[in-house]
Amino acid sequence: MKKTITLLILILSYSLSAQTWGNREYWISYEYTPKADQISEFEKAVKEKTNKWNTNFETAIFTFEVVNGPNSGTYERWVTRKDRSFFDQDFSKEIEYWKKNVGKYIADQSGQQTWRIFKGASYGWDPENTTINKFYQQNRVVVKAGMTAQFLRAHERMAKLMKALNYTGNRAVFRIENGGNTREFAVVYGFDQHGGDGSGIWTNLPEGSSVRDAYNEMFGYEAWTTDWEASSKAIELWGNLAQKTRFRPELSTKLQ
C-alpha cells in the first residue's frame, strides 16, 4: 500500500510538473557583433537570410540593434512565443546557411539564450498585441537564490494595476531559463518616442492621484513601499545590464 501511494505521488508530481512546463512561454535570443568594417555586408546577409528562412509566423525572427552602453553596435535576434516543442525541431540546414553566408561577417557572438516570460508580471505583451515599438529598454538584475517570489510580487501587482487603469504602454518580465545565469531577470518595456507620453499614459488614473496612490488603493495601506522594498532586497546584483535597443524592421520577418 505504501509503495502504491508513493508511486501515485510521483506520477501526480510529474503530471503537475509537465503541466507547469507546458504552460510556459519561451523567447529565444541571439547576439551578434559584426566586424567593424563589414557592417553593411552583415546587414545585407541578415536580410537575405531572413527573407529566405523566416517568412511566416512559425519561423519569425526579429532584429534589434543596441544603441547605447558597452554593447553598442551589437544586434539582437529574437524568436518569440514558443513552447518546449520548438527545441525538438531540426534547424541544422538553417544554421549551416547562417554560418556560410552570415558568419563570415561576425566578429563576436553569443550562444542561444532561452528566456521565460512571466505572464502574470507582464502587461501589453499578449499575442494579440502585435505592434512592435521603435525602442526597447532592457534593465537586467540578478535575484538572490530563493527570492524570486519576493522580487516578482511588485511586478505582478504593477501588471494588474496597468490593466485596471488602462495603461497605454507595456512592460514585461523575463528570466533566463537556459544559456546563462538562471537567476538573471530582464524587465523590458517598449516605446516610440523619448519625450512626452512616449512610454505610456495611465488612462484611468483618477485626477490628482499618483500611480503610487492607485497602487496603495488597490493593494492596501503602504503596499507600494512594502512591495518595492521587498523586491529591491531580493536583488543580489543591480545594474547587471541596462541598455536600449532599436527595432530594425528591414532585418526582421514581415508579418501581415
Language model: regions and residue ranges:
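Short S/T/G/P-rich N-terminal loop/turn motif that feeds into the first structured element of a domain
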Residues: 18-256
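Bacterial Sec-dependent N-terminal signal peptides
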Residues: 1-23
